């Protein structure tokens, strides 16, 4: 049973969401501020639902602190229209965001999509063949461990960042649409103002060292998508 840590200072909302997620088969822990969340967080937690606006320690500061020690998937719960919070959360390593008020079915679908990605990684570790390790320039991507190394040095990527990078490496030199990336990496259809994939690409550009062959890692093709640049 997957364990979810639900963090929101709205006690009525957390009660309703806990009831919903319990019915969906999840084991739900509840915290009402960031300090409580960090105290409850351990390796048994599979995913966090993290509200932005909270007392004591808000969601942004909580995310910043937990990313220093944990790569647990995080979905940020934001107020509708708070674009700055969404962008900042994604820059700090959130996997996705969901603006309030949200549809219960959409929340459950987002959770299951991210957990499926995590479980895929675990299955790679227990399968002899699994998906192959990919190499681009001095970058090596091991899907079994969800580990990215550049010139022998491990890169600190979130699970979503690794999945996005691996998918682009699988299509090296080919354009992959934002719609396809959103569906495969985040498990959701792309909406007109959804910038999550763009922010994850931006994070990868910031985290990846300069290539030895002098090429950029990615190219943006406006209206078409992204491609990972091949050496040739």
Swiss-Prot record:
Q: Name one Pfam family in it.
A: Trans_reg_C
Q: What happens when the gene is disrupted?
A: Deletion of cpxR in the CG43 strain significantly decreases expression of cpxA and cpxP. Increases mrkA and mrkH transcript levels. A double cpxR-cpxA mutant in the CG43 strain activates expression of pecS and pecM. Increases production of the major pilin of type 3 fimbriae MrkA as well as that of type 1 fimbriae FimA. Increases mannose-sensitive yeast agglutination activity and reduces biofilm formation in the CG43 strain. Increases promoter activities of fimA, fimB and mrkA, decreases ryhB and cpxP, but has no effect on fur.
Q: How is its activity regulated?
A: The two-component system is activated by envelope stress such as overexpression of some (misfolded) periplasmic proteins.
Q: What is this protein called?
A: Transcriptional regulatory protein CpxR
Keyword hit for Protease:
no
Residue ranges of DNA binding = 131-230
Entry GO terms, CC: cytosol; protein-DNA complex
Residue intervals of the Response regulatory domain: 3-115
What is the native source organism of this protein?
Klebsiella pneumoniae subsp. pneumoniae (strain HS11286)
The record's annotation in SUPFAM superfamilies points to: CheY-like
Q: How does it assemble?
A: Interacts with cognate sensor kinase CpxA.
Q: Which UniProt keywords apply?
A: Activator, Cell adhesion, Cytoplasm, DNA-binding, Phosphoprotein, Stress response, Transcription, Transcription regulation, Two-component regulatory system
* UniProt gene name: cpxR
| One GO MF term | transcription cis-regulatory region binding
The 4-aspartylphosphate modification is found at 51
Extract one GO BP annotation from the record. regulation of DNA-templated transcription
Which PANTHER family does the record associate with it? REGULATOR OF RPOS (PTHR48111), TRANSCRIPTIONAL REGULATORY PROTEIN CPXR (PTHR48111:SF39)
Q: PTMs?
A: Phosphorylated by CpxA.
Subcellular location per UniProt equals:
Cytoplasm
Q: What does this protein do?
A: Response regulator member of the two-component regulatory system CpxA/CpxR which responds to envelope stress response by activating or, in some cases, repressing expression of downstream genes. Binds to the promoter regions of various genes in vitro, including ompC, cpxP, ryhB and mrkA and, when CpxR is phosphorylated, pecO. Represses expression of the major pilin of type 3 fimbriae MrkA as well as that of type 1 fimbriae FimA. Repression of expression of MrkA appears to be indirect, mediated by activation of the iron homeostasis regulator RyhB.
Induction (record text)? Part of the putative cpxR-cpxA operon.
Q: Which PROSITE patterns does the annotation name?
A: OMPR_PHOB (PS51755), RESPONSE_REGULATORY (PS50110)
Fetch the InterPro entries from UniProt: CheY-like_superfamily, OmpR/PhoB-type_DNA-bd, Sig_transdc_resp-reg_receiver, WalR-like, WH-like_DNA-bd_sf
């Amino acid at each position: 049973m997957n364990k979810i840590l639900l963090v929101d200072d709205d006690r009525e909302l957390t009660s309703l969401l806990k009831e919903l997620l319990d019915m969906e088969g999840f084991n739900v822990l509840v915290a009402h501020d960031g300090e409580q969340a960090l105290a409850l967080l351990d390796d048994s937690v599979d995913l966090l639902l993290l509200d932005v606006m909270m007392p004591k320690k808000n969601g942004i500061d909580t995310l910043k602190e937990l990313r220093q020690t944990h790569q647990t998937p995080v979905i940020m719960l934001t107020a509708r229209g708070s674009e700055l919070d969404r962008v900042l959360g994604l820059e700090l390593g959130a996997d996705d965001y969901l603006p309030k008020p949200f549809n219960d079915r959409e929340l459950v679908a987002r959770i299951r999509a991210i957990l499926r990605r995590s479980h895929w990684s675990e299955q790679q570790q227990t399968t002899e063949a699994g998906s192959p390790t990919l190499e681009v320039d001095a970058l090596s991507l091991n899907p079994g461990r969800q580990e990215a190394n550049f010139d022998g040095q491990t890169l600190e990527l979130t699970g979503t960042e690794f999945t996005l990078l691996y998918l682009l490496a699988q299509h090296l030199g080919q354009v992959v649409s934002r719609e396809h990336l959103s569906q495969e990496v985040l498990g959701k259809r792309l909406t007109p103002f959804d910038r999550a994939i763009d922010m994850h690409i931006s994070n990868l550009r910031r985290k990846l060292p300069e290539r030895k062959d002098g090429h950029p890692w990615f190219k943006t093709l406006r209206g078409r998508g992204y491609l990972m640049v091949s050496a040739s």
